[in-house]
Amino acid sequence: MTQLAIIGATASGKSDLAIKIAKKIDAYILSIDSLSIYKEIDIVSAKPSKKELEDIKHFGIDFLHVDDYFSVDIFINLYKEVLQICKEQKKNLIIVGGTSFYLKSLIEGLSAIPKISKEQELHVEIKLKNLQQCYDFLYSLDREYMKNISAKDSYRIEKALLLHVGSSLTPSEWFRQNPPIPVIKNIDIFNIDVSRDILRERILNRTKKMLDLGLIDEVCHLEKKYTRLPHAMNSIGIVETLEYIDGFISKDEMIEKISTHTAQLAKRQQTFNRTQFDTIRSAPLEKLEDIILSTLA
């Protein structure tokens, strides 16, 4: 069984390339996209079409409801399930998407976490009502660990507090005693190299297409069903559309803001992909298919 990963900035053509390769090497696809994993976020996430999803089996798409809890460890467990399915059905596996942090987590692994009782969870939940107090306590306990965490980062503060409550150790002590174990040891990683100008043009065109496909109706539906509280509702494309719905910006301003924020995200993705993987092969989209197939030959 062969595994490979195709990564790249948003709107770089990853999904189309992965589907092409999957058809040629008899592979399933595991999406590493932080929005496509949610049901009903279809237009904003630019999911593959229904036909494409029927032609090639995809995992990691429409996996959760918008208000479901999601973390990297859930994704890692999903990967393990998908890997087993591929082995049983004698299929290859292509990991594809723009959230390369998930891929990095598979390669580097995650540390085990202590078992947390219901009583401890409730204790932490009550404490978190005063987020600043929790942050100050953790900072005094483990300055080295907390100095890289914002006082407003409720997710990471909660994780750090749960670690301490469950283990009676500081986060730094816990991670020293429980180093991460890699989940994937060897995988070929291919990155789509695209110029910033071309990417900006693709992003603008995709934003306009999203509007034509019913972006505003989708966001209205999501807000009505889930409110604005779930983490996914803070995503690019949703936030700007809500600003338009609220009457704060015009439709043209909404398109401009979505395009600008998406381009900024793409720049961060390109930097991450370039700096966070030891071995990676980058090439323009039009050349990468041949490079991948020749590598697998």
Swiss-Prot record:
A GO molecular-function descriptor: ATP binding
Chain residue ranges for the region called Interaction with substrate tRNA: 33-36
Binding sites annotated in the UniProt record for ATP: G8, A9, T10, A11, S12, G13, K14, S15
Reactions accelerated catalytically: adenosine(37) in tRNA + dimethylallyl diphosphate = N(6)-dimethylallyladenosine(37) in tRNA + diphosphate
Pfam families in the cross-refs: IPPT
E.C. code: 2.5.1.75
Site (Interaction with substrate tRNA): T99
Cofactor annotation: Mg(2+)
Binding site residues for substrate: T10, A11, S12, G13, K14, S15
Uppermost EC category: transferase
InterPro entries (UniProt xref): Dimethylallyltransferase (IPR039657), IPT (IPR018022), P-loop_NTPase (IPR027417)
Source domain of life: Bacteria
GO biological process, one term: tRNA modification
Keywords of this entry: ATP-binding, Magnesium, Nucleotide-binding, Transferase, tRNA processing
Gene3D superfamilies: Crystal structure of tRNA isopentenylpyrophosphate transferase (bh2366) domain (1.10.287.890), P-loop containing nucleotide triphosphate hydrolases (3.40.50.300)
SUPFAM superfamilies cross-referenced by the UniProt entry: P-loop containing nucleoside triphosphate hydrolases
Statement: the UniProt record of this protein carries the keyword rRNA-binding: no
Function: Catalyzes the transfer of a dimethylallyl group onto the adenine at position 37 in tRNAs that read codons beginning with uridine, leading to the formation of N6-(dimethylallyl)adenosine (i(6)A).
Family: Belongs to the IPP transferase family.
Self-association state and partner proteins as the record states: Monomer.
Protein name in UniProt: tRNA dimethylallyltransferase
Organism annotation: Sulfurimonas denitrificans (strain ATCC 33889 / DSM 1251)
